[in-house]
Each structure stands twice: as structure tokens, then as C-alpha cells.
Amino acid sequence: MFIKKNDKVKVIAGKDKGKEGTVEKVFPAQDRVIVKGINIVKKHQKPTNANPNGGIVEVEAPIHVSNVMLIDPSNNEATRVGFKVVDGKKVRVSKKSGEIL
């Protein structure tokens, strides 16, 4: 997967199209990511010891990795990601600028 935790991404499809945020969690098996402040859903929470009242809480739901693009730190634009071997290590490379991410 080409998206990692703490990457800055832009949503390119869905109800939050055009919004930007940082990746909080990655689920490689499901090809999904959780982005801070994006894809907020309301979850009905049962009463527990920690939250005795329960109620409706807003949480970030996972979004499919195909619906986000990595933001290139050099020019702050959404870019596709490629891979290159540098000094025997595989690194991510911006397709737009050619910079190592």
C-alpha cells in the first residue's frame, strides 16, 4: 500500500471530495484508511462504565484508499505515487515532481 500513517492526503471521490487531512490509521488488508476529520459518521453507542449515558457519537469511518491521493510536500498538490530503489531501499516517489516522499 502506498499510503502510510501521518501522510497528508486529499479526498478525490465521495461526500468529502476536495477535503484534505492526515492519515490516522491504515488497514492494508481491507485497502482502507482513516483520515482525521474526513468521512464522519454517527455511531449509536451503548451505555458502558466509561460512558454511562451512551448516546450518539460522531467518529471517523474508514475510506477506501482509491478515493484518496497523497499530497506532494514540495508543491502541496495531489500526486500519484511510484516506487524507486535508492541505495538498496525501496522508496516512494512523487509522479508529479519526481521528489522522494
From Swiss-Prot:
Assembly mode:
Part of the 50S ribosomal subunit.
InterPro entries, from UniProt? Answer: KOW, Rib_uL2_dom2, Ribosomal_uL24, Ribosomal_uL24_CS, Ribosomal_uL24_KOW, Translation_prot_SH3-like_sf
Biological process GO terms, please? translation
Q: Which CDD domains match?
A: KOW_RPL26 (cd06089)
The record ties this protein, via SUPFAM superfamilies, to:
Translation proteins SH3-like domain (SSF50104)
Transferase in keyword set: no
According to UniProt, the name of this protein is: Large ribosomal subunit protein uL24
The species this protein belongs to is Ligilactobacillus salivarius (strain UCC118)
| The protein's role, per its UniProt record | One of two assembly initiator proteins, it binds directly to the 5'-end of the 23S rRNA, where it nucleates assembly of the 50S subunit.
Q: Does the keyword tRNA-binding apply?
A: no
Concerning its family, UniProt says: Belongs to the universal ribosomal protein uL24 family.
The alphabetical list of record keywords is:
Ribonucleoprotein, Ribosomal protein, RNA-binding, rRNA-binding
* Disulfide bridge positions per record: none
Which Gene Ontology cellular component annotation is one that this UniProt entry carries?
ribonucleoprotein complex
Q: Which GO terms describe its molecular function?
A: rRNA binding; structural constituent of ribosome
Signal sequence, start to end: none
Top-rank lineage group of the source organism: Bacteria
Record-linked Pfam families: KOW, ribosomal_L24
Give the PANTHER family listed for this entry: MITOCHONDRIAL RIBOSOMAL PROTEIN L24 (PTHR12903)
